[in-house]
Curated annotation (Swiss-Prot):
[2Fe-2S] cluster binds at residues 39, 44, 47, 77. Ferredoxins are iron-sulfur proteins that transfer electrons in a wide variety of metabolic reactions. Pfam families: Fer2 (PF00111). It is found in: Plastid, Chloroplast. InterPro entries: 2Fe-2S_ferredoxin-like_sf, 2Fe-2S_ferredoxin-type, 2Fe2S_fd_BS, Beta-grasp_dom_sf, Fd_pln. Its cofactor is [2Fe-2S] cluster. CDD domains: fer2 (cd00207). The keyword Repeat does not apply. GO terms for cellular component: chloroplast; chloroplast stroma. GO terms for biological process: electron transport chain; ferredoxin metabolic process. This is Ferredoxin. Residues 3-93 form the 2Fe-2S ferredoxin-type domain.
Length: 97
């Protein structure tokens, strides 16, 4: 399946289609959208975003705790879309506070 991903970035919203077996960060880059990242392995918070609609599979994430996931935080480098999803990007500062 392929889903619509909407990213709310500091420069404004962008939308693209993302297959359910491609990480959102990778798909964003393939569509010409630069997002922050560091490790690309789900082990840091550089790529963190916050889901405002929809849901993802980020079972490869090793950084976020259950409470952060429940609040909607997502590591875009290890997140597969599981529905149409809207994510606010550039949320590392909110996460690490």
């Amino acid at each position: 399946a392929t889903y619509k991903v909407k990213l709310i970035t500091p420069e404004g919203p962008v939308e693209f289609n993302c297959p359910d077996d491609v990480y959102i960060l990778d798909s964003a880059e393939e569509n010409g959208h630069d997002l922050p990242y560091s490790c690309r392995a789900g082990a840091c918070s550089s790529c963190a975003g916050k889901i405002t609609a929809g849901n993802v599979d980020q079972s490869d994430n090793s950084f976020l705790d259950d409470d952060q996931v429940a609040e909607g935080f997502v590591l875009t480098c290890v997140a597969y879309p599981k529905s149409n999803v809207t994510i606010e990007t550039h949320k590392e500062d909110d996460l690490v506070g």
